[in-house]
């Protein structure tokens, strides 16, 4: 099967997953404590976020999806238009197809041509050569480079890689060689605390935990196998909220993606420490079903609703959500117990003094 056919398969199967999804994931195990006098005035709310010296107008980004075929190039064009119209940052899908076949360059370059002033991230795997990583950045004039980690995808992939031991050293080489920030990310199986703590030694200063709960690439690749004999890998890894809880105080900025279904999930991820939050599968489904205008409307609605949540919770900025009290329930609570995570600290982050301050600082 050609690389272009595989990319088209990924889009089809990811969209089918979104349509069949049960709707529940571990973000439902995170709830805000409601303080009825904590609210502020909507004009006081801002959505801009800053992490690792990078400032985005919005704490929401369109995460890595696709590229490498005529069909996926058209999808990338529409995604770029949506990013341009809303101000959201955007990431390319894996650019490995471009390294194999430079004739598909325009399916990735369109992310920049349609969005000349936006924040665009290139995307390579951990086996990419330094030269190819630079080519990826140059092709789309990228502002940052994502390096994706995907052992649980490669393992069931019929044509997948089976050699992972060189990845840390190669990440270090790429990070040292490119002139843009590097963001190491998973593809939906999560980054553990141990993995995150290893990244600074490789020169990495930002990570996207990209946990379980959204598109399941192990399931996608297994469905491409004649016997479907890797079904036991479906649902592998840690959820996005589990990763964020596991990563408390790692000492460098984190982004969050994987299983983001609505603005409340965005707020939950920000409250657990993410500097910004990405979505892929939900946005892809909206684009496929309704076109670029529907996606622009969805992103705009999410941003308006996120600002409404911040207003109700008393968070003037996305970062202020980390001062809001949250409760951890169900299986996520069990994960925290097993990993030795003190969840009580999240339930007692605000104080009555905070609420009194908001009352005296706003007109009721």
Curated annotation (Swiss-Prot):
Belongs to the IPP isomerase type 2 family. Signal peptide: none annotated. This is Isopentenyl-diphosphate delta-isomerase. Residues 1-24 are annotated as: Disordered. GO terms for biological process: isoprenoid biosynthetic process. Its main location: cytoplasm. One of its GO terms (cellular component) is cytoplasm. Its EC number is 5.3.3.2.
């Amino acid at each position: 099967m050609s690389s272009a056919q595989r990319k088209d398969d990924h889009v089809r199967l990811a969209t089918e997953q979104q349509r069949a999804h049960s709707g529940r994931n571990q973000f439902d195990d995170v709830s805000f404590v409601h303080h009825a006098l904590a609210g502020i005035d909507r004009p006081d709310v801002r959505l801009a976020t800053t992490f690792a010296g990078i400032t985005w107008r919005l704490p929401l980004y369109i995460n890595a999806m696709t590229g490498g075929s005529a069909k996926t190039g058209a999808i990338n064009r529409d995604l770029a238009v949506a990013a341009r119209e809303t101000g959201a940052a955007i990431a390319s899908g894996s650019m490995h197809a471009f390294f194999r076949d430079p004739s598909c360059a325009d399916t990735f370059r369109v992310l920049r041509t349609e969005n000349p002033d936006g924040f665009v991230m290139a995307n390579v795997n951990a086996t990419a050569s330094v030269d190819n990583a630079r080519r990826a950045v140059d092709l789309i004039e990228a502002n940052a480079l994502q390096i994706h980690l995907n052992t649980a995808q490669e393992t069931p992939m019929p044509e997948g890689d089976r050699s992972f031991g060189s990845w840390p050293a190669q990440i270090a080489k790429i990070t040292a060689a490119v002139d843009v920030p590097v963001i190491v990310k998973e593809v939906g199986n999560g980054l553990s605390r141990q993995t995150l703590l290893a990244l600074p030694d490789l020169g990495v200063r930002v990570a996207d935990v990209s946990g379980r709960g959204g598109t399941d690439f192990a399931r996608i690749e297994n469905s491409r196998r004649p016997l479907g004999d890797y079904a036991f890998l479906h649902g592998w890894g840690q959820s996005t909220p589990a990763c964020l809880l596991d990563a408390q105080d790692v000492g460098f900025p984190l982004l969050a993606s994987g299983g983001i279904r609505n603005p409340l999930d965005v707020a939950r991820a920000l409250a657990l420490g993410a500097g910004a939050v990405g979505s892929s599968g939900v946005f892809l489904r909206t684009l496929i079903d309704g076109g670029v205008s529907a996606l622009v409307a969805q992103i705009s609605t999410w941003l308006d609703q996120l600002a409404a949540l911040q207003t109700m919770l008393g968070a003037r900025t996305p970062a202020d959500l980390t001062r809001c009290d949250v409760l951890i329930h169900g299986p996520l609570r069990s994960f925290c117990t097993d990993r030795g995570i003190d969840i009580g600290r999240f339930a007692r982050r605000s104080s009555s003094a905070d609420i009194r301050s908001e009352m005296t600082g706003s007109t009721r």
